[in-house]
Amino acid sequence: MTYYGVLFVEKCTPSTITQLQDVLSTDLISMGDKWSFELKTFRTSAKNTDPNDTKVMHTVQLSHKNNETVTIKNQSAIITPTYVTKALYDNGCVFGTPEPFDYMLSNKLSNIWTQRQSIKGEFGVSYQTADLSIRVNNAFSYSGFQGLILELESKSSDNLEAFEKNVERVRTMLSGMGLSDVRVSSDKSQGSKQEDSSLFDLAAHYLKVLG
């Protein structure tokens, strides 16, 4: 199965991404497609809600995961796809393509949900090494540069122990660059996963290091 981890480096500059590429060049097999991500935070303005119910909701969208939106609230998550099945078209149930869920929150449900924050990265770089797929991106918010994001993806043949060693190796590499202030969130359990479950976990990793 495939394991994921997300690392966030705060005390760095936008040019750190170039320095990282130089360090990775010794292990680099190939470079992949550009990619982007966005984490949005919403807060409800609805009255008379359950006092035990959190007023905050997050959405995570990753371009390399079909731009599907993962919505996280109360430690539960759903995926809203950006496609419609052929059967729904054939039945005349829908026309056109669905709007992203976070777009509906911001534009059609703005009387209930107010967007409070957006952290995103565009034109990220993907690297393939012998052991990992590594996606790197600069993270920005409304106030400017926030830090460097690294998404790690194991080979499907790796076990959890091998992946954890590779995560630690990347942390050591960052430390060698003078980057020791690193937040890390990665898969910790071993066993078969459904594709949706992997995307839920990956979105949760982004939220943990950026939230």
From Swiss-Prot:
It is found in: Nucleus. Keywords: Activator, Nucleus, Transcription, Transcription regulation. GO terms for cellular component: mediator complex. It comes from the Eukaryota. GO terms for molecular function: transcription coregulator activity. Signal peptide: none annotated. InterPro entries: Med20, Mediator_Med20. One of its GO terms (biological process) is regulation of transcription by RNA polymerase II. Component of the Mediator complex. Component of the Mediator complex, a coactivator involved in the regulated transcription of nearly all RNA polymerase II-dependent genes. Mediator functions as a bridge to convey information from gene-specific regulatory proteins to the basal RNA polymerase II transcription machinery. Mediator is recruited to promoters by direct interactions with regulatory proteins and serves as a scaffold for the assembly of a functional preinitiation complex with RNA polymerase II and the general transcription factors. Belongs to the Mediator complex subunit 20 family. This is Mediator of RNA polymerase II transcription subunit 20. It comes from Kluyveromyces lactis (strain ATCC 8585 / CBS 2359 / DSM 70799 / NBRC 1267 / NRRL Y-1140 / WM37).
